[in-house]
UniProtKB/Swiss-Prot annotation:
UniProt GO BP: flagellated sperm motility
Function recorded in the entry: Microtubule inner protein (MIP) part of the dynein-decorated doublet microtubules (DMTs) in cilia axoneme, which is required for motile cilia beating.
GO cellular component, one term: axonemal A tubule inner sheath
The species this protein was found in: Mus musculus
Tissues where the protein occurs: Expressed in airway epithelial cells.
Record protein name field: Ciliary microtubule inner protein 2B
Amino acid sequence: MAVVNTSIPGLSGENPHYIPGYTGHCPLLRFSMGQTYGQVTGQLLRGPPGLAWPPAHRTLLPPIQSPRSPVISKGRLPPRRGHERLSSSIIPGYTGFIPRAQFIFAKNCNQVWAEAMSEFTRRHGEQESHQLPDGAKGEREVEEDQLREAEEPPLKQELAHASPYSMDDTDPHKFFMSGFTGYVPRARFLFGSSFPVLTNQALQEFGQMCSRGRAHKDPKPLSPLPRPTFQNLGLLPHYGGYVPGYKFQFGGTFGHLTHDALGLSITQKQLPA
């Protein structure tokens, strides 16, 4: 007959006890008082089996089993391309998208996922039942559809990609729709109209201004620079402006020096005194 070993690992079998400073857990230690640490732990360790140290055939906690993920048959799921996320089990913390899961509350992750997938597959099956297969149409209906598609005029791609700036002033599409947040020239000077009407007027004014600017090809000559006011007179003291050549003048008053500096020509200023 096999004997179960109930001795505690790391302690002697005759007088088991813990020494002061032991930081491990000793059950029921906090409910014992009036004795030393070694005596209390010795009594607890020598007590009935399972009181402080469970025997080998007993456990403190029941075995923990992980919850099973709900199993959904792969045949019910719609065909998918790429990753088969909908046909695989998920764990709590999954951040991917689960169809219909945002409408289910007060359940754990596995229950929400199972119910959401069942609802999604049911809705998908109903949609497929209402859709007729392509082979159900007669040849005449297919020919009519193809003929109708051929008769439809192609979209004007140039009109769709044309900018209101390049359109003619008489074009009815020369405006920006309400909600446009880009810059519209001359629009800030117009008021009292809807946004399409306002932008149409602004674009027309902008185009007229650009056309007038292109018409004037010859630039206007620049006006001659004005001559100094006090060209032939001396300046008053404390004048804060710039006087060309004044810093090279010495031995006179401010009025005399500025009169001499302003009266001399560039050639005279370059000649040595």
